[in-house]
Every structure is written in structure tokens, then in C-alpha cells.
């Protein structure tokens, strides 16, 4: 959908901030020749968000402070009980991710907060990219910018 709107230069699409998953930038998994439009921002890494979270959690030791290893807590074993082997296919990872909804917090906030804590540099890069996209759209549409520079 985004690719079609971009190619047809739909005004609403060009005058808004568009945030796409990071895997769009990965030529092996995403949108080859992705647009370099100034109103675009991409989520951190070149992975689908579900894969990014999956890899973080799967790579954690079961004694990591993230896990609540009490009897009724959310442990690594609970997280991966239906998927004990490492997943590689994105559809399987998305199914796993959907199954974590009850333990992940509102809008998966528990997972996202942990990822942000472990990846401050990636978070800062995303914030700067988002501000750049916002400022570009703000100048085009007559709003005040957030950054220090005019676009």
C-alpha cells in the first residue's frame, strides 16, 4: 500500500510522517529500492519489529533480570514454551509474538521498554530520524519545527 501511494505521489502521503518497519530497508526481506523521501522514518534495525523483540528475548539468559522466575511469573520457559526451537521464518515469529500479548504489557510496552533500555544508541538514532521527518513535514505544512535546523 505505501509503495503504491509513494509511487503515485498521493498528497496526503507526501505531507505526513510515514514510519515504516526497519526490515523495509533490508533488500533480502523488504521493499527493494525503498523510498528515501524526507518524510519517512524507519523503526530501528533492519529487522521486523517482531523479529527484533524475538531475538532480544530468545538471546537472554533465563536468569536475566527481565524474567520473573517466580512460580507464577513470566519466565523464559513460559515465553518460549510453544516454540522451544529458534524460529527463522517471519510468519512463525509473528505468530509467537501475537501469543505473547497477555504478558507483554499494553501495546507490548514491557518488551519495547526492555529493548529501548538495551539499545539506547538505536533509540537515539530513531528519535533523530523522526525529528528530521517531522521538521520536513512541518516546514511543508506551516507548523513549528522541533529541531534546531530549518529543512
PLM ranges: what are they?
Residues 1-151:
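Acidic, Mg2+-coordinating catalytic modules of nucleic-acid enzymes
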Amino acid at each position: 500500500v505505501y509503495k503504491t501511494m509513494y509511487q503515485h505521489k498521493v498528497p496526503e502521503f507526501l505531507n505526513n510522517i510515514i514510519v515504516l518497519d526497519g526490515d523495509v530497508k533490508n533488500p533480502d526481506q523488504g521493499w527493494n529500492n525503498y523510498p528515501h523521501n524526507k518524510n519517512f522514518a524507519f523503526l530501528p534495525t533492519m529487522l521486523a519489529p517482531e523479529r527484533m523483540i524475538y531475538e532480544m528475548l530468545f538471546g537472554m539468559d533465563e536468569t536475566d533480570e527481565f524474567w520473573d522466575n517466580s512460580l507464577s511469573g513470566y519466565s523464559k520457559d513460559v515465553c518460549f514454551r510453544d516454540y522451544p526451537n529458534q524460529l527463522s521464518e517471519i510468519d512463525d515469529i509473528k505468530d509467537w509474538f501475537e501469543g505473547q500479548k497477555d504478558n507483554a504489557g499494553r501495546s507490548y510496552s514491557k518488551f519495547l521498554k526492555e529493548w529501548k533500555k538495551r539499545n539506547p544508541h538505536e533509540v537515539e538514532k530513531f528519535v533523530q530520524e523522526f525529528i528530521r521527518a517531522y521538521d520536513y513535514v512541518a516546514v511543508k505544512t506551516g507548523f513549528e519545527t522541533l529541531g534546531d535546523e530549518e529543512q
